[in-house]
């Protein structure tokens, strides 16, 4: 899964379609999630759960931004969606915040998930550090590639007007970004399902022990 994540990251660096790049970045992140799950450790499970929540928010926000650009430019190609800092300056901040979240920059929940996953995967085998270093580097590379190529450079010559975002779009992006950054302050919510699962197992074991105790008393009475 780590090798697959590195290969998909290389594919991301060759994409010229906004939505394809974001979709491939999701596949690359799921490579490290799968590795963490396969270690079958506590940190692996909690890190995978946290990263899936974080990437669900971050990836959804990036898809939203890609759709906003598509509605105005009429194309998803990076060859046309460039120079957006001049065309849509009000949305450039959101591109930066969500692209930095996609590369697990602090204080996003992605950072917490990746630290937990790195801990679990390296504890399973130190050789995985090689692939993890490549995966982390290329994750930052394609996130910066997405932001720099779309926001900077000369604006597409077929565009002759200036565009601003609407209140609905800003609210939608804010509701993606706020949980992504605030959940790290209360990260035990991300581990809640593990606590509930452990409590369920304890209750089942307690009920089974009680049944055995009652059965033993009936046999010896």
UniProtKB/Swiss-Prot annotation:
Top-level taxon: Eukaryota
Record EC number: 7.1.1.2
Recorded catalytic activity of this chain's protein: a ubiquinone + NADH + 5 H(+)(in) = a ubiquinol + NAD(+) + 4 H(+)(out)
Topology relative to the membrane: Multi-pass membrane protein
GO cellular component: mitochondrial membrane
Keywords: Electron transport, Membrane, Mitochondrion, NAD, Respiratory chain, Translocase, Transmembrane, Transmembrane helix, Transport, Ubiquinone
Gene Ontology terms describing biological process: ATP synthesis coupled electron transport; electron transport coupled proton transport
GO molecular function: NADH dehydrogenase (ubiquinone) activity; ubiquinone binding
First-listed, main subcellular location of the protein, grouped into a coarse class: mitochondrion
Ranges in coiled-coil conformation: none
UniProt signal peptide: none
Transmembrane segments: 20-40, 45-65, 78-98, 121-141, 170-190
A Pfam family the protein falls into: Proton_antipo_M
Cellular compartments annotated: Mitochondrion membrane
Functional description taken from the UniProt entry: Core subunit of the mitochondrial membrane respiratory chain NADH dehydrogenase (Complex I) that is believed to belong to the minimal assembly required for catalysis. Complex I functions in the transfer of electrons from NADH to the respiratory chain. The immediate electron acceptor for the enzyme is believed to be ubiquinone.
Entry-linked PANTHER family: NADH-UBIQUINONE OXIDOREDUCTASE CHAIN 4
Family: Belongs to the complex I subunit 4 family.
The name this protein goes by in its record: NADH-ubiquinone oxidoreductase chain 4
Origin species: Anopheles arabiensis
Chain's gene name: ND4
């Amino acid at each position: 899964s780590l090798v697959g994540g590195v290969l998909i990251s290389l594919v991301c660096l060759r994409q010229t379609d906004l939505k394809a790049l974001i979709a491939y970045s999701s596949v690359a992140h799921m490579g490290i999630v799968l590795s963490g799950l396969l270690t079958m450790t506590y940190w692996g499970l909690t890190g995978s759960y946290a990263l899936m929540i974080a990437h669900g928010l971050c990836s959804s926000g990036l898809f939203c931004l890609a759709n906003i650009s598509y509605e105005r430019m009429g194309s998803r190609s990076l060859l046309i969606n460039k120079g957006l800092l001049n065309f849509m300056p009000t949305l450039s901040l959101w591109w930066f915040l969500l692209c930095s979240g996609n590369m697990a920059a602090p204080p996003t929940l992605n950072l917490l998930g990746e630290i937990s996953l790195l801990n679990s995967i390296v504890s399973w085998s130190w050789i995985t550090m090689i692939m993890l270093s490549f995966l982390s580097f290329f994750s930052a590379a394609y996130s910066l590639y997405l932001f720099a190529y779309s926001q900077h450079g000369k604006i597409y010559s077929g565009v002759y007007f200036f565009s601003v975002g609407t209140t609905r779009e800003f609210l939608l992006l804010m509701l993606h970004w706020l949980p992504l950054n605030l959940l790290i302050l209360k990260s035990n919510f991300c581990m809640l399902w593990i606590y509930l699962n452990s409590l369920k197992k304890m209750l089942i074991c307690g009920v089974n022990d009680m049944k055995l105790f009652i059965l033993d008393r009936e046999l010896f009475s």
